[in-house]
């Protein structure tokens, strides 16, 4: 099944625990756990040294709030992008979270994730 064929509710149910884990392991600075649900292409593309530097030096990346607000879902090709409102526990304001999901070897994997 193509993930784009799922309902919004089904996609959000798949996305929520994946985003929750990204927030948790980002806050803890645990790159190995942070990347455990990445697609093979995303895992190859992200340099562990750069990611480790980001965890060590980004106040935002180490202080993400657990509460999120899903803002929408975009379907394209074989992937969906879930957009979230993300907050920090230390910095005032709101950020845009982006989580790109698709199937790889029959499992839902993360093909992209970022906070703007």
Describe each PLM feature range:
Residues 52-103, 112-116:
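Surface-exposed, charged secondary-structure patches
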Residues 1-28:
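Short, low-complexity N-terminal intrinsically disordered segments enriched in polar/charged residues
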Residues 27-41:
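Short, well-ordered alpha-helical segments enriched in acidic and aromatic residues
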Residues 46-50:
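Boundary/linker segments of alpha-helical solenoid repeat arrays
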Residues 18, 43-45:
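Localized chelating/binding microdomains
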């Amino acid at each position: 099944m193509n993930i784009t064929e799922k309902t919004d509710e089904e996609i959000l149910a798949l996305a929520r625990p994946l985003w929750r884990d990204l927030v948790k392991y980002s806050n803890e600075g645990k790159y190995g756990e942070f990347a455990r649900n990445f697609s093979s292409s995303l895992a190859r593309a992200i340099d562990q040294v750069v990611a480790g530097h980001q965890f060590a030096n980004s106040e935002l990346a180490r202080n993400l709030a657990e509460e999120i607000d899903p803002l929408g879902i975009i379907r394209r090709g074989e992937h969906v992008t879930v957009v979230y409102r993300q907050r920090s526990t230390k910095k005032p304001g709101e950020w845009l979270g982006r989580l790109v999901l698709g199937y790889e070897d029959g499992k839902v994997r993360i093909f992209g994730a970022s906070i703007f």
